[in-house]
């Protein structure tokens, strides 16, 4: 979907690959603070789906993630098609099976989340507007 906006020039001169990297980072961020709500579970499923599609890999020595841009595009297209099909068909049971397959934080991802928590990186920024 973002590829269409990019092809139409709606994203300016930005390299489309930065959108893929940002999306992956946002999935990881979401898993840190909202794994229990619907938004968090959807992002966990997206993360696991894209990982299974080879959209990114994790270096076991460093714990760092690397995006495969071609596979990320194919994976995100496949994820969007899967979700749209579930919605269009009203396939509630299919969504349940999808969530069973992809909607769980893996032990490896949980270890990476714990590593982030140990670094005390803030989960969210709070902005107070106006006078106290």
Residues covered by each model-derived region:
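Extended, compositionally biased alpha-helical segments that mediate assembly or anchoring
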Residues: 85-132
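Long, well-structured alpha-helical subdomains associated
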Residues: 3-99
């Amino acid at each position: 979907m973002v590829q269409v906006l990019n092809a139409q020039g709606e994203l300016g001169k930005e390299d489309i690959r930065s959108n893929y990297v940002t999306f992956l980072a946002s999935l990881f961020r979401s898993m840190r603070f909202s794994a229990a709500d619907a938004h968090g579970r959807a992002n966990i499923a997206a993360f696991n789906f894209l990982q299974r599609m080879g959209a990114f890999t994790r270096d076991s020595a460093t714990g760092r993630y690397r995006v495969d841009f071609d596979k990320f595009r194919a994976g995100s297209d496949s994820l969007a098609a899967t979700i749209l099909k579930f919605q269009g068909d009203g396939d509630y049971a299919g969504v349940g099976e999808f969530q069973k397959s992809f909607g769980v934080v893996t032990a490896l991802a949980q270890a990476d989340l714990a590593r982030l928590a140990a670094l005390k990186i803030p989960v969210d920024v709070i902005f107070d507007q106006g006078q106290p």
